[in-house]
Amino acid sequence: MSLLDFFRSRKSQNSASIAKERLQIIVAHERGQRAQPDYLPQLQKDLLEVIRKYVPIDQEQIQVELENQGNCSILELNITLPDR
């Protein structure tokens, strides 16, 4: 085994562990999105329609997130309002 082989094998193990870590992050993110209730997209659409009655905004300017903390659910609504 030459000195170069030692560094090559070490590098590929390092790349594999990095790839594994990235994949775990992606899987965790996907699982988090599946845990959201089915009504959340419709709720976002309804809220957007109500807000549009008063302020002209696009769909990209409203974010609805549901967060579970223990036995409590928190609905967070972020709206980017246009300047007057």
UniProtKB/Swiss-Prot annotation:
Keywords: Cell cycle, Cell division. Pfam families: MinE. GO terms for cellular component: plasma membrane. Coiled coil: none annotated. GO terms for biological process: division septum site selection; regulation of division septum assembly. The keyword Cell division applies. The keyword Transcription regulation does not apply. InterPro entries: MinE, MinE_sf. Prevents the cell division inhibition by proteins MinC and MinD at internal division sites while permitting inhibition at polar sites. This ensures cell division at the proper site by restricting the formation of a division septum at the midpoint of the long axis of the cell. Belongs to the MinE family. HAMAP family: MinE (MF_00262). This is Cell division topological specificity factor. It comes from Pseudomonas aeruginosa (strain ATCC 15692 / DSM 22644 / CIP 104116 / JCM 14847 / LMG 12228 / 1C / PRS 101 / PAO1).
